[in-house]
Amino acid sequence: MKFGWVNVIGDNWEEKKKIVTTALESSIPVVVAEPEDIEKIKELGNIKVASHSLDADIVLVNKNDNIEFLKEAKNLGKETAIYIPIESKEDEEFASEVARFGFVDNIILEGRDWTIIPLENLIADLFHRDVKIVASVNSVDEAKVAYEILEKGTDGVLLNPKNLEDIKELSKLIEEMNKEKVALDVATVTKVEPIGSGDRVCIDTCSLMKIGEGMLIGSYSRALFLVHSETVENPYVATRPFRVNAGPVHAYILCPGNKTKYLSELKAGDKVLIVDKDGNTREAIVGRVKIERRPLVLIEAEYKGDIIRTILQNAETIRLVNEKGEPISVVDLKPGDKVLIKPEEYARHFGMAIKETIIEK
C-alpha cells in the first residue's frame, strides 16, 4: 500500500498549524517536523510525527548525523528513518548500505539535479529488503512518478507542499493508487436450501454503498460470492446502505491486501473491502459488527466443474449479484441462475494466499 508523509514547512507556528490540520483532515498518517513542534502537533490530533528526537513517533536523522542514534531509537522500540540527499553515486551506495543495517525502517531520498534513474537503481537494489523507500517530492505530479517507477514504485513520498491544496491532492492520489481490482467470474447456482438457524454477522461500515456494491464472502477460500449491500428499496424495511448482511460467523471475507478474515474476527476499526459488479474496490472502516441468531440458507453453485458453497441469512433483503450486475434476493434465487464470484487459485492460511492442497467441503 502506498503512503504519504507531509513536511511541516513554515516561518511561524500558525503556518505550520494549517499544514498539520490539513494533513489530519486528509488522512495523512505522518508529518515531518522540528523537535520543538512535536508537542504542539500532538495537541492538534492523533497523527504520527517524524523528527530528530526520541520523543517522536518516527525517529529521523539526516545523512551526516550519527546513525547510532537510530540504533538507540530502535532498541527503544521506535520506528526509524534516515534522510539522504542523492548528489552522487556514493550517496546511492550509502543508501543501499544503510538498508542492510537492520535498524532503519524508512529511507527518505531527495534527488538534486537528477531524473528518476537513482530511484530506479535503489528500488531494484532494495526490492527484497525490509525497508521502505520514501521519495522527497515537491508536487503531486512528482509523487505520481515516484509511485510508478519500475511498476513497483516507491513505498511512499514525503511532500514539501507549496500550498494546502497540494496535501488534499496527495491524499486523493494515494486513495486512487491503493485501489485494488479483483477479477470476478460467473458461477451457476445448483442448489438453494434452508438449513435451520445459526449465528450470522452484519457488517455496518463507516461508508455508504450504492447499487452494485457489496463484499466478497464465502464458506470456501477458493471462491467468494459477491454479497450485495442493503441498498435496495423494499416494502419491508428501510435501506441500510452502510451494511452488508454477510453470513455466518465461520465465513471468509476479503479484506485489503488480498487477505481474508473470518467474519467472527471483525470488529470496529477494522478495514474491509467494498467491491462492485465490475471488480472495482475501495476500503471501508467497520463501524460495528452485529452477530445474531437467524434462519440460514445454503447456496451451492458450480464453477468450472467445481462445487462451491456459501451460507447466508434466509431473508428477502439478503442478495447476491447476478451476471448482469443486478442484485438478486436469496428468496428468488433458483438453480440455473448465474451469480458473480471471485475464484481463488490458492488456499488460505491465517488469511494469506498460499500454494497448498486444502480440501474444503
Curated annotation (Swiss-Prot):
<keyword id="KW-0057">Aromatic amino acid biosynthesis</keyword>
<dbReference type="Pfam" id="PF01959">
    <property type="entry name" value="DHQS"/>
</dbReference>
<dbReference type="GO" id="GO:0003856">
    <property type="term" value="F:3-dehydroquinate synthase activity"/>
</dbReference>
<comment type="function">
    <text>Catalyzes the oxidative deamination and cyclization of 2-amino-3,7-dideoxy-D-threo-hept-6-ulosonic acid (ADH) to yield 3-dehydroquinate (DHQ), which is fed into the canonical shikimic pathway of aromatic amino acid biosynthesis.</text>
</comment>
<keyword id="KW-0520">NAD</keyword>
<dbReference type="InterPro" id="IPR002812">
    <property type="entry name" value="DHQ_synth"/>
</dbReference>
<protein>
    <recommendedName>
        <fullName>3-dehydroquinate synthase</fullName>
        <ecNumber>1.4.1.24</ecNumber>
    </recommendedName>
</protein>
<keyword id="KW-0560">Oxidoreductase</keyword>
<comment type="similarity">
    <text>Belongs to the archaeal-type DHQ synthase family.</text>
</comment>
<dbReference type="GO" id="GO:0051287">
    <property type="term" value="F:NAD binding"/>
</dbReference>
<dbReference type="GO" id="GO:0008652">
    <property type="term" value="P:amino acid biosynthetic process"/>
</dbReference>
<dbReference type="GO" id="GO:0102042">
    <property type="term" value="F:dehydroquinate synthase activity"/>
</dbReference>
<dbReference type="GO" id="GO:0009073">
    <property type="term" value="P:aromatic amino acid family biosynthetic process"/>
</dbReference>
<keyword id="KW-0028">Amino-acid biosynthesis</keyword>
